[in-house]
């Protein structure tokens, strides 16, 4: 091989390696991306069954029904007439309760309009609301900055209680 052919082979091998690495990274990201929706968003734009999403809003008042074992059903609402029924099997965060901010991650069942959650994130304290949920509620005029009592010295800001199956 001449010097020019060796250089061309090294460049071609390097480009092949870079292309393979980019494709692997793109594949990994496409498998882990979960888009965020509120119940009103789902009413406008339905999501295909078995597509992973994050569903955020407030736990509906009077909607929490505990089943056998650690099975729980509740609704997530955004303050409007839109609500999504959620089915979760696992231990809920200690701070989970009706009227609290919540973000669930999972997918819709292939049959019916029930959201099957495998992760539940609960609002940490009375002043913290997950940014995604707060932004959507602000856009609808249902949330204002400074809602709730001030926490002691900003304690707990930016933290979420998390439960996963």
UniProtKB/Swiss-Prot annotation:
Disulfide bonds: none annotated. It is found in: Cell inner membrane. InterPro entries: CcmE (IPR004329), CcmE-like_sf (IPR036127), NA-bd_OB-fold (IPR012340). It is a single-pass type II membrane protein. Residues 144-154 have a biased composition (Low complexity). Keywords: Cell inner membrane, Cell membrane, Cytochrome c-type biogenesis, Heme, Iron, Membrane, Metal-binding, Signal-anchor, Transmembrane, Transmembrane helix. GO terms for molecular function: heme binding; metal ion binding. GO terms for biological process: cytochrome complex assembly. Residues 1-7 are cytoplasmic. Residues 144-165 are annotated as: Disordered. GO terms for cellular component: plasma membrane. The chain crosses the membrane at residues 8-28. Heme binds at residues 124, 128. Signal peptide: none annotated. Its main location: membrane. It holds the Pfam family CcmE. Residues 29-165 are periplasmic. It comes from the Bacteria. Belongs to the CcmE/CycJ family. Heme chaperone required for the biogenesis of c-type cytochromes. Transiently binds heme delivered by CcmC and transfers the heme to apo-cytochromes in a process facilitated by CcmF and CcmH. HAMAP family: CcmE (MF_01959). PANTHER family: CYTOCHROME C-TYPE BIOGENESIS PROTEIN CCME HOMOLOG, MITOCHONDRIAL (PTHR34128:SF2). This is Cytochrome c-type biogenesis protein CcmE. The lineage of its organism: Bacteria, Pseudomonadati, Pseudomonadota, Alphaproteobacteria, Hyphomicrobiales. The gene is ccmE.
